């Protein structure tokens, strides 16, 4: 039985569910879950939690992501990416804008911004996914969402050809960000229709492309009984949270029993959640959170016995 976090390189053409389904067959275990959907035409890092690490999948998902995308100015699509039907075209020429204009524009997207999720997305409205409305040719009001663009920049020259302009960007962002919507919004600010024509996720949950294994590599390592060496411990998935190392055996026992604590029993100022780590084994004991009605207390959220 495997336990840990496995960064998978998802190839284009596969859904995130396809990856999990194939891994369950390869590893012969059902206790597997991915940490955030990647669209079929998107390649890149997809951290997968296996065994006891499935308990920290939400935390891996919250750790932020990085992407490299190609923005195509001059044509918009129904899906906001290269897979959709054309909605609008407008010829683009090198006299319309230059790379300095693009760089200044990208700066304006840094920070907390509002996005309207695309119709072809899994965001739910009134209990129904948006893509279900889209497939039935139904329109529905999509709620604006705040997302965090931590960094964004151009990483290629502008390529003007066939009445369109293409350039690559790198984006570091929080969860829930739609890069294809970002591409169309860049076009709106330039005064042109636009879409995202290619996307690769280069980092997710602290894992980068060089950490990631293809399904074929995973199959080979499993057959060689050496896959466990490539898995990251569940502790890695919690590195985004503050932590305290516990030495006292009596306190360790209380934590593992799921007892409440007064915050002032610990030196650290606990604001929201805290991870307790065994000082001897370096293993996670539990995740605690501030009590919702008694701010001076902390209570267990997850205990790892």
Swiss-Prot record:
EC identifiers of the protein: 5.4.99.25
Taxonomy, superkingdom: Bacteria
Swiss-Prot/TrEMBL keywords: Isomerase, tRNA processing
Active site feature: 39
Catalytically driven reaction(s): uridine(55) in tRNA = pseudouridine(55) in tRNA
InterPro entries according to UniProt: PsdUridine_synth_cat_dom_sf, PsdUridine_synth_N, tRNA_psdUridine_synth_TruB, TruB_C
GO terms assigned for molecular function: pseudouridine synthase activity; RNA binding; tRNA pseudouridine(55) synthase activity
Span of the signal peptide: none
Entries under Pfam families matching the protein: TruB_C_2, TruB_N
GO BP terms: mRNA pseudouridine synthesis; tRNA modification; tRNA pseudouridine synthesis
CDD domains according to UniProt: PseudoU_synth_EcTruB (cd02573)
Sequence similarity: Belongs to the pseudouridine synthase TruB family. Type 1 subfamily.
Function field: Responsible for synthesis of pseudouridine from uracil-55 in the psi GC loop of transfer RNAs.
Record-given protein name: tRNA pseudouridine synthase B
Organism: Staphylococcus aureus (strain NCTC 8325 / PS 47)
